[in-house]
Design a protein with these regions (language model features):
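Single conserved hydrophobic/aromatic residue that forms the stacking wall/gate
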Residues: 158-168
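Trp/Phe/Arg-rich N-terminal binding region typifying the photolyase-homology
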Residues: 1-156
Length: 168
């Protein structure tokens, strides 16, 4: 039987535990290829670089304990992921969503590249209790006042549908 491979793209979620994208991918493939791409289009400060270095070392060690290897790249994520897809037999690509405008635009392009290659692509909420576009008032519009928003979100915390499988 031929093994199925999937790429998990680590970004700001440099952890193996409680990682919904990684959990979902592990149920679909025989082997996960973990990657991290230092996006040269994004500038980060010295404190963030220090945190990133320590976190990548920790993640690298954690993956190594599971007989894996974290593949680290620097450059344009679109080009790097395209190159990996051309040179491998990957069936799935996954990551946890980021919500800043740059990441949304980049991720949309990458998802298009992946799916046009006939490869399944999944992104997951790995940061927030609720997706921003899912929290609306009774009128179907977004909340403008915090207290009603908080009351609505507080109720959602205790429903089984709101809890992600990876944290149950």
């Amino acid at each position: 039987m031929v093994a199925t491979y999937g790429i998990h793209w680590f970004r700001q979620d440099l952890r193996l535990q409680e990682n919904p994208s990684l959990l979902s991918l592990s149920k679909k493939v025989d082997q996960i290829i973990p990657i991290y791409i230092f996006d040269l289009n994004q500038r980060i400060g010295s404190t963030s670089k220090w945190w990133l270095e320590k976190s990548l070392i920790s993640l690298y060690d954690s993956i190594q304990k599971h007989n894996g290897k974290l593949n680290i790249f620097a450059g344009d994520p679109e080009k790097i992921i395209s190159s990996i897809l051309k040179n491998s037999n990957v069936k799935y690509v996954s990551w946890n969503r980021l919500y800043d405008p740059y990441s949304i635009k980049r991720d949309t392009k990458i998802k298009s590249i992946v799916t046009s290659s006939k490869i399944e692509c999944d992104s997951h909420n790995g940061y927030l209790l609720n997706e921003p576009w899912n929290i609306k008032n009774k009128s179907g519009t977004f909340f403008k006042v915090f207290t009603p928003y908080w009351r609505h979100c507080d109720c959602l915390l205790y429903t089984s549908d709101a809890a992600d499988e990876s944290v149950r």
